[in-house]
Amino acid sequence: MKTLILLSALVLLAFQVQADPIQNTDEETKTEEQPGEEDQAVSVSFGDPEGTSLQEESLRDLVCYCRSRGCKGRERMNGTCRKGHLMYTLCCR
């Protein structure tokens, strides 16, 4: 049973890769070469718009960036960002 689940997951992954091929274009190369482009501010929103006051206080000062080279200083990794076919690290402080 575990083998069937594993094979199904691999087949689904293969279909996803074929449906979303990675293309090496000049645009992607230009994006990687520009140092100012690696730090992009991201608006992060969680849950219900009427959230509790405790949640509002803790999320009010949350600032996140999509970084290509990892998090800096007091930031910590909170996931990934995607811009086109490029994946970045979501760093929040």
Curated annotation (Swiss-Prot):
One of its GO terms (biological process) is defense response to bacterium. SMART domains: Defensin_propep (SM01418), DEFSN (SM00048). Residues 20-58 form a propeptide. Disulfide bonds join 64-92, 66-81, 71-91. One of its GO terms (cellular component) is extracellular space. Its main location: secreted. Residues 1-19 form the signal peptide. Keywords: Antibiotic, Antimicrobial, Defensin, Disulfide bond, Secreted, Signal. Paneth cells of the small bowel. It holds the Pfam family Defensin_1. It comes from the Eukaryota. It is found in: Secreted. Residues 22-54 are annotated as: Disordered. The keyword Chloroplast does not apply. Belongs to the alpha-defensin family. Probably contributes to the antimicrobial barrier function of the small bowel mucosa. This is Alpha-defensin 16.
